[in-house]
Amino acid sequence: MPNIEELKQRQEKIRNFSIIAHIDHGKSTLADRILEKTETVSSREMQAQLLDSMDLERERGITIKLNAIELNYKAKDGETYIFHLIDTPGHVDFTYEVSRSLAACEGAILVVDAAQGIEAQTLANVYLALDNDLEILPVINKIDLPAADPERVRTEIEDVIGLDASEAVLASAKAGIGIEEILEQIVEKVPAPQGDVEAPLQALIFDSVYDAYRGVILQVRVVNGMVKTGDKIQMMSNGKTFDVTEVGIFTPKAVGRDYLATGDVGYVAASIKTVADTRVGDTVTLADNPAAEPLHGYKQMNPMVFAGLYPIESNKYNDLREALEKLQLNDASLQFEPETSQALGFGFRCGFLGLLHMDVIQERLEREFNIDLIMTAPSVVYHVNTTDGEMLEVSNPSEFPDPTRIDAIEEPYVKAQIMVPQEYVGAVMELAQRKRGDFETMEYIDDNRVNVIYQIPLAEIVFDFFDKLKSSTRGYASFDYELSEYRRSQLVKMDILLNGDKVDALSFIVHREFAYERGKLIVDKLKKIIPRQQFEVPIQAAIGQKIVARTDIKALRKNVLAKCYGGDVSRKRKLLEKQKAGKKRMKAIGSVEVPQEAFLSVLSMDEDEK
């Protein structure tokens, strides 16, 4: 065990940093190069996007989870420094993950694509880094691209963000250019962690994973004090205590250590069996010498998008609950509560940060836990003011009060920043208007790129705004949004009736102006998707008691006259009457099978299909 002096000297050599960038600006590739350069990973083990360990991340080419890795780097001054690289996601839905990783760092490498320049999410993440008082090192990446224009990007960084980019490293992570300069800048510019080894332990939990054998494994950043195997630790939020069975670091693989001291980033295993005992953002301290107060944690993220998740096989309900609990462990922004639906049985109402987050959770449940799911249309949290003066928060359309009790409905608006090349500004404005957006302002970033700011209802963004934006700008637009306010809107709840029965899972909220078109579109779409039954099935869209659209699925009929060669007409009529009576009886008691696509079709309602 090293003495206090040695620990303090070691602390001087620690550098904690993360890499922030917009999607596809080369963040994961740069992380790969840094791992190679510091010989953390042998070339035999190297694979592209090494830190994106989830299959999903590699397939989509995005980073979803944060990862923390320890590297040793021998600098030009002859000293060996300990780097902790904390990898962060770049997508708008995972801003929460970014804020968590930045809270564990003292510096951030800002990667900007030399051809594309600054994008909306680059800005969003830089502001997060500035909030955390991080030292920001700009890196202009992909300088080997034919379209690269590093000098333009340099002035952009200075003008738009206001950072001094005179010493920005010009690099190409793919070709391995400029990596050493980046590492030297980390040594020189990123401050060593502050904190006192002799103070009581304070460690911030910034992530956790569940291991079937060792229980919950916490990923922590030690801010003060130290922790070693055999210590008794205590969670500061709920006072529960655990015995530490193992501490260690990640060099992508987990490697056991004797202790973690101030400034270290690593993991702690303490046979924590119940998932609910640990919360990301909580502070760990020692039970026999606790810290006076917890660390400043993270702000709790509120979900913006809600959807129902139902197991296709109803006996998988408990498996789904366990799976959601395990996912919640290292994704603290996921929230869920049980709900039932007449159409779909038992399931959960889940809250997500955005659509990509929802998509990723659904896919992780299906892949990692083998649960087949039906997902209902996503909705947002509405504020419903009733006639007797109550204000209800409703996220599930089927829980809306009776229309006669509603005085007014308010819906959330977001402030959307859309960065786009000049020639597409018209297309973006048209899309935003169509989505009921209110124009706020427009700023020119350089000669060619414009930042357009709109106030748009979140419910309109939830559907397919992002895909539409990408297709109307050939993929050049980038987009970031934050919740701004609630506003009164003319909203109504639309129910879909099959064979006269409401299907609660197909209900949705729509603006009165678009109600008729939306209703017509959905009934036509359902007609194509729901298979024909033995009896005629009417599909209706209704607002309250008023039917606004209807279509019928024609019945299948068996040719009952086939075995009746020639024969009397009354014989034929008798067979047809018998069939008719059978169909009538069937219709009275028959239920309609609704395939999964029907629920999804409500989501992908496309104005362009009109």
From Swiss-Prot:
Subcellular localization: Cell membrane
GO molecular function, one term: GTP binding
InterPro entries cross-referenced by the UniProt entry: EF-4 (IPR006297), EFG_III/V (IPR035647), EFG_V-like (IPR000640), EFTu-like_2 (IPR004161), G_TR_CS (IPR031157), LepA_C_sf (IPR038363), LepA_CTD (IPR013842), LepA_IV (IPR035654)
UniProt keyword Protein biosynthesis, yes or no: yes
Keywords: Cell membrane, GTP-binding, Hydrolase, Membrane, Nucleotide-binding, Protein biosynthesis
Residues given in the record as GTP binding sites: D24, H25, G26, K27, S28, T29, N141, K142, I143, D144
Gene3D superfamilies: 3.30.70.240, Elongation factor 4, C-terminal domain (3.30.70.2570), Elongation Factor G (Translational Gtpase), domain 3 (3.30.70.870), P-loop containing nucleotide triphosphate hydrolases (3.40.50.300), Translation factors (2.40.30.10)
UniProt superkingdom: Bacteria
Positions of the tr-type G domain: 12-194
Catalysed reaction equations from the record: GTP + H2O = GDP + phosphate + H(+)
GO CC, alphabetical: plasma membrane
Topology in membrane: Peripheral membrane protein
Keyword Cell inner membrane part of the UniProt annotation: no
Main subcellular localisation: membrane
Gene Ontology biological process terms, A to Z: positive regulation of translation
EC id: 3.6.5.n1
Pfam family, one: GTP_EFTU_D2
Protein family (similarity comment): Belongs to the TRAFAC class translation factor GTPase superfamily. Classic translation factor GTPase family. LepA subfamily.
Protein task: Required for accurate and efficient protein synthesis under certain stress conditions. May act as a fidelity factor of the translation reaction, by catalyzing a one-codon backward translocation of tRNAs on improperly translocated ribosomes. Back-translocation proceeds from a post-translocation (POST) complex to a pre-translocation (PRE) complex, thus giving elongation factor G a second chance to translocate the tRNAs correctly. Binds to ribosomes in a GTP-dependent manner.
NCBIfam families to which the protein is assigned, alphabetical: lepA, small_GTP
Protein name: Elongation factor 4
Originating organism: Streptococcus thermophilus (strain ATCC BAA-491 / LMD-9)
